[in-house]
């Protein structure tokens, strides 16, 4: 019984160690409401995708693909959706 408990403890520790090093990516897609805006000092406008990273630690990466003036159709037709699909991995979010 002690061996089973020891093996179980080792397994749980190994699982915790591997999961703690994994990062999760949140891919932001959309229009101007989420898009990156230039000129931070002179432009008070911010898309929500710009500030999202501030709500997470270093285990979560926010990858913002939002672009001003885009619709779902133009996002797909311009190949922007494919770029996200090519990079997404299990455990990521869009």
Where are these regions (language model features)?
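Short, intrinsically disordered low-complexity segments
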Residues: 1-2, 40
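Bacterial Sec-dependent signal peptides at the C-terminal "C-region" and cleavage site
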Residues: 3-5, 11-24
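Conserved phosphate-coordination/catalytic loops
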Residues: 7, 43, 75-78
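Generic detector of leucine side chains in alpha-helical contexts
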Residues: 8, 13-16, 52, 73, ...
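Serine-esterase "nucleophile elbow" of acetyl-processing enzymes
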Residues: 21-66, 83-93
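Short beta->alpha junction loops
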Residues: 66-72
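Charged, often glycine-rich, active-site loop that binds/positions anionic groups
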Residues: 72-84, 88
């Amino acid at each position: 019984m002690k061996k089973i408990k020891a093996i179980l403890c080792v397994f749980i520790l190994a699982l915790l160690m591997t999961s703690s090093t994994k990062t999760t990516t949140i891919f932001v897609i959309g229009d101007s409401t989420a898009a990156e805006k230039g000129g931070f000092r002179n432009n008070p406008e911010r898309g929500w995708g710009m500030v999202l990273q501030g709500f997470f630690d270093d285990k979560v990466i926010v990858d913002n693909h939002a672009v001003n003036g885009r619709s779902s159709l133009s996002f797909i037709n311009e190949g922007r959706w494919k770029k996200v699909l090519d990079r997404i991995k299990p455990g990521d979010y869009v």
